[in-house]
Amino acid sequence: MVEVSEKPNTQDDGVSKQENRNPASSSSSTSDKEKVAKKGNSDATKSSTPEDLDAQLAHLPEHEREILKQQLFIPDAKATYGTLFRYATRNDMIFLAIVSLASIAAGAALPLFTVLFGSLAGTFRDIALHRITYDEFNSILTRNSLYFVYLGIAQFILLYVSTVGFIYVGEHITQKIRAKYLHAILRQNIGFFDKLGAGEVTTRITADTNLIQDGISEKVGLTLTALSTFFSAFIIGYVRYWKLALICSSTIVAMILVMGGISRFVVKSGRMTLVSYGEGGTVAEEVISSIRNATAFGTQEKLARQYEVHLKEARKWGRRLQMMLGIMFGSMMAIMYSNYGLGFWMGSRFLVGGETDLSAIVNILLAIVIGSFSIGNVAPNTQAFASAISAGAKIFSTIDRVSAIDPGSDEGDTIENVEGTIEFRGIKHIYPSRPEVVVMEDINLVVPKGKTTALVGPSGSGKSTVVGLLERFYNPVSGSVLLDGRDIKTLNLRWLRQQISLVSQEPTLFGTTIFENIRLGLIGSPMENESEEQIKERIVSAAKEANAHDFIMGLPDGYATDVGQRGFLLSGGQKQRIAIARAIVSDPKILLLDEATSALDTKSEGVVQAALDAASRGRTTIVIAHRLSTIKSADNIVVIVGGRIAEQGTHDELVDKKGTYLQLVEAQKINEERGEESEDEAVLEKEKEISRQISVPAKSVNSGKYPDEDVEANLGRIDTKKSLSSVILSQKRSQEKETEYSLGTLIRFIAGFNKPERLIMLCGFFFAVLSGAGQPVQSVFFAKGITTLSLPPSLYGKLREDANFWSLMFLMLGLVQLVTQSAQGVIFAICSESLIYRARSKSFRAMLRQDIAFFDLPENSTGALTSFLSTETKHLSGVSGATLGTILMVSTTLIVALTVALAFGWKLALVCISTVPVLLLCGFYRFWILAQFQTRAKKAYESSASYACEATSSIRTVASLTREQGVMEIYEGQLNDQAKKSLRSVAKSSLLYAASQSFSFFCLALGFWYGGGLLGKGEYNAFQFFLCISCVIFGSQSAGIVFSFSPDMGKAKSAAADFKRLFDRVPTIDIESPDGEKLETVEGTIEFRDVHFRYPTRPEQPVLRGLNLTVKPGQYIALVGPSGCGKSTTIALVERFYDTLSGGVYIDGKDISRLNVNSYRSHLALVSQEPTLYQGTIRDNVLLGVDRDDVPDEQVFAACKAANIYDFIMSLPDGFGTVVGSKGSMLSGGQKQRIAIARALIRDPKVLLLDEATSALDSESEKVVQAALDAAAKGRTTIAVAHRLSTIQKADIIYVFDQGRIVESGTHHELLQNKGRYYELVHMQSLEKTQ
């Protein structure tokens, strides 16, 4: 928790100035809101330059500025392509060298074919001039055809080694980058995370590392092969006749100029796209992790629009990126075709001049054709390399950052025997993320060894800052913290944190079992290496001490129960007790309790507090508490106000002083009307408690009878109910099994995303067809050129004339290709980025449409869904944009080329076409294998990404437990598992890819052998032969290129199926459904009629067992009872987060399941136990309470005044325009809660639901806010869940829950007189002076 110092007593003139300033700025247009949203996120994610930081911190003294800069500065890493391989091992580099050589050798195979071609051309001329016999000709032809076969076999082996090798090394290196990035993240100081959203970490560790992997894997091999082909071709050309080769080499210069000029813009656009997606990922992570809040307030539309702000920015830069690549590719094709024309023109002059012969010219021209064509294959890969460099820059900037407070460092001393005396000496503290606010000023405090020191005071006064400084989450700007007289800066940080156990206000559990969560408390302690049996005993003992053992054993799987992501499957109190058990299991020297019992009910709190009191003995304990009943026995109570110590002493001393502490006590004092209880009465009450546990529960006020008339029948009913509900829930789960979709269905589904671009997409298809037809046309020109150069010396005049004509035709073809390729690139850039934008936007909206049960499923964790949004949408573009255009283009090339070949020489064409089905079969089989591989790989990476996201979003808990090494071991284990699984799939798919590429040589061998025979017999002339061979070469190559897109298509198919499943999933409780009655007005009668409920993820665990409850209009009722008894579940059912298994919830006599869910929820407002704020300004967060934008400032101000937050907001430099940070990280818990209350009040609800609404507030704020809530409750039906009983003593009826039933009800006074369960709870919270 990051606290901000408040100034509640702002003078009137200061407030009026703020009011005059703020409304104008806060009444913003949509574009202004987008700017604020962008600002809020960009502030959180951009690398801060030293100049930026100096400007932000200019008002501070130099030494303070330096301390804050160390905690904030993020270096702006300049990545080059070489830096992507920085984590390659020696073995990786050796392997890379081998596979690079294989790629280069594979690339040299095609130019070697031109040597054979030139030789055969000479042989053809010889037989035409009758210089050799037909048998000699046939022998030479057969031998050269066999050379083609040998070349094909060699290329198959070389390509296979290259593809498998590069994919393996790429995955291996990327695996290390993922691990290094997470390792670097876990070593950062907490100030770094105040600037960084957990969603950005997920985006970096999934989408960005995938981009790096894409840029260093098989695309490197393909590029090396293409470059090798290019250079080999030109080397052969220079050897044959250097003058012509030199002239044709101008191609290289032109291409380098084009690529160099455009790639600068490509890299910048790629970087900006990644930044925008990172910011969007942070918003998505915030929203999904707080989905209950978004659902309760119906803010899905507003939050989706906030997400779209960043998607639009990413779309803008993405379009620029794709357009530049399209223009670059078009320019390169134009240069290539122009070069053909230049070659023919100059070649004809050299031939006529007698400087060279036909064989050399044919060899050189064909080498130039192949070499120039191959360079075209490099262009599509440059985008992958550029994206990899951009992604690398973002990732390496974090990896290279030297943390100011590094938990992974071995530096620093240790103290052999820690006594535990803590001293804060002259402390001044400023949070790095909010440098304009001083949180602590001149704090001097000694915490004696073995004593308990309590810190109390208003929210934001600096209490939790004490914990942050002692744990070294932050460094103070001046002063020092000492442990046993040693400045903690000189101590080893990991060792220091292992001496301290922390239980924080919002308990964080990890997505594993209860046993493993408690075991985490043993990290770094001597007990960590004990036997499993001893560890088990310690864990059970700690759970018993924390009053957690009984509820754990009540769970079906006991200690082996998985708690879900962040412990969502447990109630707040249950999570808190497990966190306490985790803290005390290692018997620490220093215990920090930051609101450690805030989430517990009074009964649990009493037991746990006794356990904590016992655990505190003999160790140094610092307790931060708002609930003063928990700290009255402390050895020293320190009252902190405004970042300074106001007073300190024992409970009695401070009460006698009649100062600030007494005011806090009075604010929280419960008005009990009872006499002193004798010791005998206490014994009697204990006996009553025991008898109550085995007898019939107390009468329910509303039912008029005992809920369970017969105990045996009741037990039987529960058993039956369990079976029935388990069947119902298992049926619901089975209905959600993965649906399989046909390829056609998925293609239609993806095409739907580009529906608005249909017309321009048709234009794109038109240009793609024109581009594709270019190569077969070039084949005609090429054959005509060869035929022209074959003319005898007597026709040299005609030769020069024809050569000029065909050279000009090549130039014209180049210009046409420039236009068509560039136009195609621009059009598909628009379509592709629009598809990605809509896919992300609609899938995010589809997620927000789902009911809460969807998010409870383990596979739908925040990390998994955020990763899905960032990664799978990118995969979806594998069948759109540049990929789709290229596939259509090469398909056209294949069809037109084969058609032309059939038209001019059907015999030779048919023989060559017979090989095409084999190529298609290889390609499609590879496509199918990759689709299967992608499905498996995606799940593995989702799992590891989800785990990384969970760890980073709980960084304070990870840091305080020194769990960094454990997190890394699990994460690296997940990555290793995925690498092993992928290798076999890669081996299969690469086999087929190599086959599909090398088959073109076998096709050429067959074509030359059969076509040469036809030529030798005189059936075909030179034009027919060269045309058919040229068409088949490029046609079959085009088929191979189509299948090089198989990985992208495989990913797209898998992603499309996931999207279709998400879009097709219609939730049971559907916010988009128009069905159900809409309520215009509501009186506010709420009824529960025999409600039974179990959570869908835990069908064997009953939560509510026949609940009957009636709340009359305008009535204020309170729900109290032990943790896990069903109080918060009751609130969830009123909100209709879930539907009941049996029975019903009614409003004004109408079953809420038959009402329109949006209309119904519009009459409710919820304030939860853990407040949720989103990226953006304070004003934006308050306005999330209403579904319209035209809310006057006065209404916003009124809601904030009612929630006692207005004065604090106006004291901030930017007032209502203050950016709250990721998840409200810039504010303290109390400040966040009051903004959440303001958000509820601006809604003006008829039914107000308060789930621990004031649990995060100090006594002073609580009193004012409670009064505001009491006033707000007038005329409204209010249901309040409370552990702190002082907040609900004025309730009209208080219902005491136990095990899903009401066991007692009445007013505060009636229940006190009954001296039952409620009476005990009140007694435990008594704030009377200790005797």
Curated annotation (Swiss-Prot):
Per UniProt, what is the membrane topology? Multi-pass membrane protein
Query: What protein family does this chain belong to?
Result: Belongs to the ABC transporter superfamily. ABCB family. Multidrug resistance exporter (TC 3.A.1.201) subfamily.
| Example GO BP | oligopeptide export from mitochondrion
Q: What's the protein called, per UniProt? A: ABC multidrug transporter MDR2
Q: Which GO terms describe its cellular component?
A: mitochondrial inner membrane; plasma membrane
Per the UniProt record, which residue ranges are transmembrane? Answer: 93-113, 147-167, 219-239, 242-262, 325-345, 358-378, 762-782, 810-830, 884-904, 910-930, 995-1015, 1025-1045
Write down the chemical reaction(s) this protein catalyses: itraconazole(in) + ATP + H2O = itraconazole(out) + ADP + phosphate + H(+)
Spell out the residue ranges making up region: Disordered: 1-51
Q: What triggers expression?
A: Expression is induced upon exposure to a wide range of unrelated cytotoxic compounds, including acriflavine, benomyl, ethidium bromide, ketoconazole, chloramphenicol, griseofulvin, fluconazole, imazalil, itraconazole, methotrexate, 4-nitroquinoline N-oxide, tioconazolethe, or the allylamine terbinafine. Expression in up-regulated in the presence of keratin.
Q: List the InterPro entries.
A: AAA+_ATPase, ABC1_TM_dom, ABC1_TM_sf, ABC_transporter-like_ATP-bd, ABC_transporter-like_CS, P-loop_NTPase, Type_1_exporter
Provide the alphabetized UniProt keywords: ATP-binding, Cell membrane, Glycoprotein, Membrane, Nucleotide-binding, Repeat, Transmembrane, Transmembrane helix, Transport
Keyword Metal-binding found: no
Q: What's this chain's function?
A: Pleiotropic ABC efflux transporter that may be involved in the modulation susceptibility to a wide range of unrelated cytotoxic compounds, including terbinafine, 4-nitroquinoline N-oxide, and ethidium bromide. May play a role in pathogenicity.
Recorded GO terms, molecular function?
ABC-type oligopeptide transporter activity; ATP binding; ATP hydrolysis activity
Gene name linked to the record? MDR2
Per UniProt, residues of the ABC transporter domain are 422-667, 1086-1324
Provide the glycosylation site positions. Answer: N293, N529, N860, N1108
Q: Where is the composition biased (Basic and acidic residues)?
A: 1-20, 31-41
Superkingdom: Eukaryota
Q: Which residues hold ATP?
A: 457-464, 1121-1128
Domain (ABC transmembrane type-1) ranges: 97-387, 764-1051
Query: Disrupted gene: resulting phenotype?
Result: Leads to increased sensitivity to terbinafine, 4-nitroquinoline N-oxide, and ethidium bromide. Leads to a reduction in infecting activity, characterized by low growth on human nails. Impairs the MDR4 induction when the fungus is challenged with amphotericin B or terbinafine.
Where is this gene product found? Cell membrane
